[in-house]
């Protein structure tokens, strides 16, 4: 029985070039290290700091990462991609070209007999009022169609600016306050889920009650944390020793 890995908030493309190169190398090395033990990998939002697909165009700067994801697919590793608040403009590239199943919002299912609920977590906090309005605006289908009319050399820089604005707004919130997330998870526990996994807060965190567990995956900007499930236990792990 192989392992299931859960990763969120890598935000590839956010840092200055030299720092970004080191972080990409770290992330790729991590993916190579787990390829012999992983049955499946869930990317729970914000793998990229920005992602947008036109009909014939994708951002070229992430080629090295995309190549590694293709390698994982070729090795038979099952992969799933949930959108975050920076990479929700997912088209069909990941599914058709890389064999990565994508989802519009959340994922619910069973792994080794346990019921999981996965969601990036953006918009849950009561303080996220402004973001919830922005989220509806950015995801409105007509706005997406209008945006695709822009040439990529104009549209992509503009979208990166919007992505940066979203990050600045999120950074102003109290990131270590998990009360709203715990309350959300408790409702899912009542629905019968054993594990609730989210990201977005950039703080690794675990809450347990009555044999059920809520986990926030942290990030790959400061914590380099991820979740791993071995069929018996769900735990937080770190790519770098703390």
Predicted regions and their residues:
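A generic membrane alpha-helix/interface feature
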Residues: 27, 63-64, 94, 117, ...
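Conserved beta-sheet core of the metallophosphoesterase superfamily
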Residues: 101-104, 122, 128-134, 175-239
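Conserved histidine-centered catalytic loops in small-molecule metabolism enzymes
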Residues: 9, 239-241
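Active-site-proximal beta-strand elements of phosphoester/diester hydrolases
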Residues: 3-11, 115-122, 213-218
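Short glycine- and Lys/Arg-enriched binding-loop motifs that mark or flank ligand-binding interfaces
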Residues: 41, 80, 117, 195, ...
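Core catalytic region of metal-dependent phosphoesterases/phosphodiesterases
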Residues: 2-3, 7, 12-111, 222
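Conserved catalytic scaffold of divalent metal-dependent phosphoesterases
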Residues: 87-191
């Amino acid at each position: 029985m192989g392992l299931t890995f859960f990763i969120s908030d890598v935000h590839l493309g956010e840092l200055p070039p030299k720092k970004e190169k080191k972080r990409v190398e770290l992330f790729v090395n991590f993916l190579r290290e787990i390829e012999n033990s992983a049955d499946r990998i869930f990317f729970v939002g914000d793998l990229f700091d920005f992602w947008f697909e036109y009909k014939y165009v994708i951002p070229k700067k992430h080629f090295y990462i995309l190549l590694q994801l293709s390698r994982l697919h070729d090795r038979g590793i099952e992969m799933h991609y949930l959108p975050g608040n920076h990479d929700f403009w997912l088209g069909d590239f990941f599914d058709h070209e890389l064999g990565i199943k994508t989802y519009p919002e959340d994922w619910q299912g069973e792994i080794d007999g346990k019921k999981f609920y996965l969601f990036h977590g953006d918009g849950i906090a009561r303080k996220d009022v402004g973001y919830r309005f922005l989220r509806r605006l950015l995801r409105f289908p007509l706005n997406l169609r209008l945006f695709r009319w822009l040439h990529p050399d104009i549209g992509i820089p503009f979208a990166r600016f919007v992505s940066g604005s979203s990050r600045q707004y999120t950074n102003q919130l109290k990131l270590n306050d998990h009360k709203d997330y715990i309350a959300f998870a408790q409702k899912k526990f009542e629905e019968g889920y054993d594990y609730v996994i989210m990201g977005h807060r950039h703080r690794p965190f675990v809450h347990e009650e009555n044999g059920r567990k809520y986990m926030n995956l942290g990030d790959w900007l400061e914590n380099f944390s991820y979740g791993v499930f071995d069929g018996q236990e769900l735990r937080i792990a770190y790519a770098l020793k703390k």
